[in-house]
Amino acid sequence: MSCSAHGGGMKVNGSTILEGERIVLVPYKREHVPRYHEWMQSAELLEQTASERLTLEQEYDMQRSWFQDENKCTFIILDKKKWLQPEMTEIDCMAGDVNLFLNDNKLDIAEIEVMIAEPSCRRNGFGREALLTMMNYGANHLGIKKYEAKIGCGNKASLSLFHKLGFVETSYSDVFNEWTLQLNVTEGIQEWLAEATNHVSVHNYPFRPRNTTSSDH
């Protein structure tokens, strides 16, 4: 979606695709909204993401607002296996989303969150790869030095995932019943992120792989 490099006004990822091993990250566009709205009818997802149920029109407004907000950086997660099939639309490939929320006062700190909304896409490593890809992107392109994640205490899967990525609890909110976890992007962490995502390729949006079986005219 949109995200400026330290308030410079340039929407860094507005036309960026990040192609990984299992997933592809694309900017959150208007055409993605109906499927996203379907996902957010789930009481489970609403609880896990601390979100309120919105109407479809409100969801369109939210997408437009986020696209214009330079302190928010959002990618839709696509299932790469589906994405490689020419007959599949981008909407058919949608699996979830991954987000960065930059701190207005400290632009080198970002809250990060991930959601794998499609049940068939869970437990496939999508969330881990999306987080690593986003964290490396944020560190390299946005100058992020610290990541924060806010996770409900009942969301054991997310807590486990973030722990495995090196995040540690720094505080607990009784009001929201959630943990705040943090990870400092040290030189060692940045090297680890670069190595963990060295398979990721960057394309300009929109992009789909060419069908290599078709003739080139």
Feature locations, PLM:
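GNAT-family acyltransferases
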Residues: S2-C121, H141, V168-H217
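Active-site acidic-Proline motif in GNAT/NAT acetyltransferases
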Residues: E118-N124, C153-G154
